[in-house]
Amino acid sequence: MDAAHNAVQHDAVQAEHAHASRRGDTRARIQQVALELFAEQGYERTSLREIAERLGVTKAALYYHFKSKEDIVRSFTEDYFGRLDALIAWGREQPPGAQTAQELLDRYITIVMESGEVFRFLERNQATIHGTEDGKHRFTQFRPRLAALMEVITGPDAPLRSRIRAAAAIFAVSTSCMFFMKDVPEAELDAVLPAPPTQEELRAILLEFATDLSSDMVRLSSGKLGHTPRT
């Protein structure tokens, strides 16, 4: 009897996991299709009905996940912040030092590069998005996470110079990804770059730059980085 009961419980758990996985897949598909339509015809010109039609689902099925376009845009930010929160939690569990700082920056680069489409959408629609209630609070939501990332990189009670370098590394990663991964016309890109970098090249360069900065920051925080006085 116990064996049969356990088998039923196991099947129920497996079914729930499968259902949750399907929900997550559908949500991700909605986000991807919404991004495609927003890029093709603009955020304001895109309706939920068009998103549902592109997906091949009813509006009711779409409403189960998102009640409005604003909800979809909010989900982009929530997902990004959720990944940052997980990264910060991971970093706080690691021993402080250059290796942890490098690994955290490496993981941060991954998050930013995988969020490229979302960043491009937010950049193209700044006026519209920033006018929403969520848009107004986006940076205030990012600031405490930036402070937490900086603390993981430098350690607690780091000197101001070290914290500024940490912030510079974080912003350099996100800004560089937004610029070098942008789908700008070739003529415009050729004016500033001999050849567009591949994602692998961009990732390697960013990691090298961030690693150099993080190594200096860790030494500076521990008092091991010399400072040449002004003359």
Report the location of each language-model feature.
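Amphipathic alpha-helical packing segments from all-alpha helical-bundle domains
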Residues: D85, H130-A167
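C-terminal peripheral helix-coil segments that are non-catalytic and often amphipathic
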Residues: M1-V8, A147-P156, F179-T231
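Hydrophobic alpha-helical connector segments
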Residues: S75, A89-V118
